[in-house]
Amino acid sequence: MKTGIVGFGHVGKLMKKTFPESLIFDPFLKLGLKEEINICDVAFVCVPTDMLENGDCDTSIVEECINWIKSELIIIRSTVPVGFTDKMVEKYKKRIVFQPEYYGETQDHPFNNVSRDWLSFGGEPSSVNLAIKAYQLIINSEVKIFQSNAADVEMAKYMENTFLATKVTFVNEMFDIAQGLGVDFNKAREIWLADPRIGRSHTFVYEDKRGFSGKCLPKDISSIKNQAANGKVNTLLLDAIVEKNFYLSNKNKK
């Protein structure tokens, strides 16, 4: 099965490690040709979905790629709003699956390779089965494979990143409270983390880089807030997290 990767940024480069024989197309880096992608059975779309000025997710590059890709299956790795994949299937009449990426931005992120023990795919069952077929060439049978409709999986990705943003914000607030009470935060943190329900990830506090930042968490919490507003759902908790993170980011400037 021939695979192609559209977009050779952080996610695209890690996808190349996962599927080393893949053809690459990235017009900004002047890599490859569209025609090479179009002879592939599966095309992975790994392009940016940056935050627009109004806080929405910019899906224009993803849609542009879907428009011209002629591969039998398109797998969207970029984070997109809930319902986007289904809209693209309806509009372009193509086989499209959403597969969230979990690569993270740190050098030693635990999901930077195919050793992760789960994969998730969202889309029509026949399209999802084709995506799984591609991965079965590189994974072992111990890997759990979750399948659902695209909207469920899109929502799960936003839940993940929003939860991590919430956790970072919570830990930063506990850090400030500990300092205010004359408590050693790091000692308290280790005692807290002894409870296996908590989980150690995203519990460091960097005194010179407070709050959450990067390419994913800020844009994704903003996007899901806007999506909720469109559905007339209040987001008091998420609003407070964004406000607190703004406060923390201003601390970084002092």
Which residues make up each language-model segment?
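Hydrophobic anchor at the start of a short beta-strand
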Residues: 3, 21-25, 74, 94-96, ...
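Short, well-ordered alpha-helices that flank and scaffold nucleotide-derived cofactor binding pockets
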Residues: 17-21, 67, 90, 226
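Short, well-ordered alpha-helix to beta-strand connector turns
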Residues: 19, 39-40, 71-72, 93, ...
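NAD(P)+-binding Rossmann beta1-loop-alpha1 motif at the extreme N-terminus of oxidoreductases
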Residues: 1-42
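Rossmann-fold dinucleotide-binding core
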Residues: 47, 79-157, 224
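Interdomain hinge/lid region at the active-site interface
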Residues: 151-154, 166-254
